[in-house]
UniProtKB/Swiss-Prot annotation:
Superkingdom to which the source organism belongs: Bacteria
GO MF annotation: an example: D-amino-acid dehydrogenase activity
Name assigned to this protein: D-amino acid dehydrogenase 1
Gene3D superfamilies named in the record: D-Amino Acid Oxidase, subunit A, domain 2 (3.30.9.10), FAD/NAD(P)-binding domain (3.50.50.60)
Binding sites annotated in the UniProt record for FAD: 3-17
Entry cofactors: FAD
């Protein structure tokens, strides 16, 4: 089957790779000059299935009000002048209850755990290297209240069979020796030994090269004008004014999927603006071993070979990619507060990206009511964590194979009248 994948971030490239491996003829189109040069370029670096949680959670509305008056707030909101922003936030608020949170977190952990298994298998099969580390991740709590509040997430982990370790202040240093001088600031932590880390951009670039060897064609520096629709079915896309026909089109354009598809399918994916700095490492002993997530500031600190990636926070401000100096100060503060002397923040590079977020936090992977049109987007802050699983899942569904995990509640159908799509569905039906 001829498949056209729109978007060459980590979601688009993993989709293309697994589709090609299943025997499909795949072409990838992107406006950038190469793979992973937009949202996948400088994310926080962790592959953390156990920490897969919706931003829409009980208590978040009240927290958001308090954050409005904090200097280092993890979430901020500015009206972007669109009705869609208001509708999206209202849908998110409707998910800020215990029942919805538990349901959404279960779906996210399910896909994220599967994805971690997929990247392990991929690594074993191909030897792909991306400055990865398989040493677990650690969430640190600055207050006893935060530590006590982890009980709800631990209950979900136990139901999903995810191994975890609840650590005291002194136990933290055994997992992350670099916290020795700052552990007095912390109440404890939650360690997930099966989580991983790695450079998403490096992974995506190298996987794209492997995909090319499987026959995938990449067309970069190309403007995707529109989809080609004939007889109520998608038959390809208009690219730089040229018709590129296909049996099936996969839209993996991140937060840009929403405006691109607005005349065909309502996709409730909003750009959640995030930030990162990449810090040259100066002292390995004062740096993290893997990923440390600061629960207070919603910031992740990740060790690469000779760099420290510090990323997180969120702004609901629309398609605004201007760099915010205040967010840089927050990132610099958090890494310096927990790992003083580990890196030279004065030489850090600053980046921002628009993470595609659904109101319930769960991505949209699978078919749509429009024949020939499939979607793989909406992974929010967990695109790197969920990429391989989403790509494999999409490939299985397109190929008519039964997926390894439940998939019906991951499709766009959960937002449409009529409910969930079937677990498997012929690609061209």
């Amino acid at each position: 089957m001829r498949v056209l994948v729109l978007g060459s971030g980590v979601i688009g490239v993993t989709s293309a790779y697994y589709l090609a491996r299943a025997g499909h003829e795949v072409t990838v189109v992107d406006r950038e000059a190469g793979p992973a040069l937009d949202t996948s370029f400088a994310n926080a670096g962790q592959i953390s299935p156990g920490y897969a949680s919706p931003w829409a959670a009980p208590g978040v509305p009240l927290k958001a009000i308090k954050w409005m008056f904090q200097q280092h707030a993890p979430l901020s909101i500015r009206p972007d002048g669109t009705l869609f922003q208001l509708q999206w936030m209202w849908q998110m608020l409707r998910n800020c209850n215990a029942a919805s949170y538990a349901e959404n977190k279960e779906r996210m952990v399910r896909l994220a755990e599967y994805s971690r298994d997929c990247i392990r298998a991929l690594r074993a099969e191909t030897g792909i290297a991306y400055e990865g580390r398989q040493q677990g991740t650690l969430q640190v709590f600055r207050t006893q209240q935060q530590l006590d509040g982890a009980a709800n997430d631990i209950a979900v982990l136990e139901r999903a069979g995810v191994p975890y370790e609840l650590l005291s202040r002194d136990d933290l240093v055994r997992s992350e020796p670099g916290l020795a001088s700052t552990r007095h600031k912390l109440a404890g932590g939650l360690r997930l030994p099966n989580d991983e880390t790695g450079d998403c951009q490096l992974f995506t670039t190298r996987l794209a090269a492997m995909a090319e060897k499987l026959g995938v064609r990449f067309r970069f520096n190309s403007r995707i004008n529109s989809l080609i629709v004939q007889n109520d079915a998608v038959r390809g896309a208009l690219v730089d004014g040229e018709a590129m026909t296909a049996d099936l089109v996969v839209v993996a354009m991140g937060s840009y999927s929403t405006p691109f598809l607005k005349n065909l399918v309502g996709v409730p994916v909003y750009p959640l603006k995030g930030f990162s700095i990449t810090v040259p490492m100066t002292d390995a002993e004062r740096s993290p071993v893997s990923t440390v997530l600061d629960e207070t500031y919603k910031v992740a600190i990740t060790r690469f070979d000779d760099r420290i990636r510090v990323g997180g926070m969120a702004q609901i401000v629309g398609y605004d990619k201007r760099l915010d100096p205040g967010k840089r100060k927050t990132l610099e503060f958090v890494v310096s507060d927990l790992f003083p002397g580990g890196g030279d923040v004065s030489r850090a590079t600053f980046w921002t990206g628009l993470r595609p977020m659904t109101p319930d936090g769960t991505p949209i992977v699978g078919p749509t009511p429009v024949r020939g049109l499939w979607i793989n987007t909406g992974h929010g802050t967990l695109g790197w964590t969920m990429a391989c699983g989403s790509g494999q899942l999409l490939s299985d569904l397109v190929s008519g194979r039964s997926p390894a995990i439940r998939a019906d509640d991951l499709s766009v159908y959960r937002y449409l009248r009529g409910g969930q799509a079937p677990a498997t569905k012929p690609a061209l039906a």
